[in-house]
Amino acid sequence: MNNIRKNHPLMKIMNNSFIDLPAPSNISSWWNFGSLLGACLTLQIITGLFLAMHYTADTTTAFSSVAHICRDVNYGWIIRYLHANGASMFFLCLFIHIGRGLYYGSFTLTETWNIGIILLFTVMATAFMGYVLPWGQMSFWGATVITNLLSAIPYIGTNLVEWIWGGFSVDKATLTRFFAFHFILPFIIAALVLVHLLFLHETGSNNPLGTSSDSDKIPFHPYYTIKDLLGLLLLILLAMMLVLFSPDLLGDPDNYTPANPLSTPPHIKPEWYFLFAYAILRSIPNKLGGVLALISSILILAIIPILHTAKQRSMLFRPLSQCLFWTLTADLFILTWIGGQPVEHPFITIGQAASILYFTLILILMPMASLIENKMLKW
């Protein structure tokens, strides 16, 4: 068995990636989220596959097919709610995973980091298109509002929107293509994950100290397989509490009303994991400006390696940067809250202040704090 594991062409790759992989001896539980994301992706692909067997991508039957899955299909309700809440779990792990990368300086592994950003965009696109499929009120109006943002692009905007819609409004053609893309994208994500891991294993993992891990490595199995398993059990516990006790906690009641192009919901909002970006979008009165701010709020991650001015890689021994990091975290919570509120006073002002703070922290305050900490090292 030992020989097969180390010599067989396919087994050898698996062995070098998950069993005999040299891993830093001091990585904490914040490093668990990569494997949890893999588990989430697997769950989403499996549950999605079973949902696709019963779903119909047609405007007249989409809503009733989802109702049919919940009522008539054996365990259809749990598959549907696992898929819906699995997306929330996915984004929760994703945000923590990115936060850990920022805190411990993992963005210095630029290839891995950049593939991660591409993965983030792809997952966001997949989640958005998945939200449209049940064809409830929020599905329809969410699709209309978000796709309409592309019309802010000069010259080609309107044509681009109509091209995406497949007509002059969100209709059957839009739903069909969104289903097709929603089905194929998770497999593209899985391929990108392999590239992400490929680049990571070229350099090896970072560790909480931000120092080179070469001096002390341990095999991934059994140490980190057991550790990841504990994380997985906790994730399953959280997911099951959501699915079995309050499956609609993170959803929108409006999505239990079939899509009606003639009646607009009082407050159009996306799922909770997009609310921070939605708040930034709404905080700018100009349409093009809002769209640019929305894209920048995520694309800003790409320039973080350039903005890294500190002499130390990790924030572990940098109190000023730590303080700003947690301020940024709090700011993102505020933006998430504001994104779910109606557009009225005082929410508009709070949203604008939080949006300005978000960009100021990343672009100005954090690099400045790092420079001050560099000076403090000499004292």
Curated annotation (Swiss-Prot):
One of its GO terms (biological process) is mitochondrial electron transport, ubiquinol to cytochrome c. Its main location: mitochondrion. GO terms for cellular component: mitochondrial inner membrane; respiratory chain complex III. Heme b b566 binds at H97, H196. Gene3D superfamilies: Cytochrome Bc1 Complex, Chain C. One of its GO terms (molecular function) is ubiquinol-cytochrome-c reductase activity. Binds 2 heme b groups non-covalently. InterPro entries: Cyt_b/b6_C, Cyt_b/b6_C_sf, Cyt_b/b6_N, Cytb/b6-like_sf, Cytochrome_b, Cytochrome_b_C_euk/bac, Cytochrome_b_N_euk/bac, Di-haem_cyt_TM. It is a multi-pass membrane protein. It comes from the Eukaryota. Keywords: Electron transport, Heme, Iron, Membrane, Metal-binding, Mitochondrion, Mitochondrion inner membrane, Respiratory chain, Transmembrane, Transmembrane helix, Transport, Ubiquinone. Its cofactor is heme b. Pfam families: Cytochrom_B_C, Cytochrome_B. Signal peptide: none annotated. The keyword Coiled coil does not apply. A ubiquinone binds at H201. It is found in: Mitochondrion inner membrane. The chain crosses the membrane at residues 33-53, 77-98, 113-133, 178-198, 226-246, 288-308, 320-340, 347-367. SUPFAM superfamilies: a domain/subunit of cytochrome bc1 complex (Ubiquinol-cytochrome c reductase), Transmembrane di-heme cytochromes. Heme b b562 binds at H83, H182. Heme 1 (or BL or b562) is low-potential and absorbs at about 562 nm, and heme 2 (or BH or b566) is high-potential and absorbs at about 566 nm. Component of the ubiquinol-cytochrome c reductase complex (complex III or cytochrome b-c1 complex) that is part of the mitochondrial respiratory chain. The b-c1 complex mediates electron transfer from ubiquinol to cytochrome c. Contributes to the generation of a proton gradient across the mitochondrial membrane that is then used for ATP synthesis. The cytochrome bc1 complex contains 11 subunits: 3 respiratory subunits (MT-CYB, CYC1 and UQCRFS1), 2 core proteins (UQCRC1 and UQCRC2) and 6 low-molecular weight proteins (UQCRH/QCR6, UQCRB/QCR7, UQCRQ/QCR8, UQCR10/QCR9, UQCR11/QCR10 and a cleavage product of UQCRFS1). This cytochrome bc1 complex then forms a dimer. Belongs to the cytochrome b family. This is Cytochrome b. It comes from Eulemur rubriventer. The lineage of its organism: Eukaryota, Metazoa, Chordata, Craniata, Vertebrata.
